[in-house]
Amino acid sequence: MNSLTYEQVREMLLACTERIMRNEPYLTRADAAIGDGDHGTGMVIGMKAAREVLEKEADGDDIGKLYSDTAKAMETAMGGASGMIFSTMFAGNAKEGAPMQEMSTEDFAARMAEGLRAIQELGHAQPGDKTMVDALYPAVEALKSHVSESFEEMLDAAAKAAYEGMEASKKYVAKFGRAKNLMERAIGHQDAGASSTWLIFQEMADFIRGEKTPDPDPESIGEAKRGAELVSKKIINDPLEVVKE
């Protein structure tokens, strides 16, 4: 399969919203380990907003408009930087233009590459900073490397790369967000944003192949409270020094 129709794209995005909502406990546990613990909830809010648009535009015929409307709804519902970043990733930095009734592998790869560029411009994150970029960057590179192949092969490669990037995030010290206050203590924990990014790419690959890979087990993340408890301790003098009460 080298192109997707409007309806296939719409159904694929709907499947992604379902995957994220179903895995809220997994994402919450990942974020609770070293962050605020609200990533899963925020993603579900965004995905519910996306679903409303995707269901409302069932009779549409412009893929570009579908992406754009979905991104706007997610950003409005989620709010803040996270809303802007994840709506940009989910919709590939959609821009309305000439109506698009079919999407080729080249179109999809270019859209996601532009989304990555916009996210990095917005947040200045690089691979290795323990953010969603750890999964998104290698996924986009895989899309570009396999763009001449079928959607099945291209998305399989992207999902694998996103997973490996998410796993690699465990090795990094966080450069952004609340987790950066943990410094080396964040090592060993995966980034929640990278986890969401992997789930989205995995669901797209599953949808195109007509298969279902198992959802990850929240318990596989390990002790979820350790990082959050460390960050919640009183901080005095040096804002990077966590002082136990």
Give, region by region, the residue ranges found by the protein language model.
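N-terminal loops that bind phosphate or other acidic moieties
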Residues: M1-E245
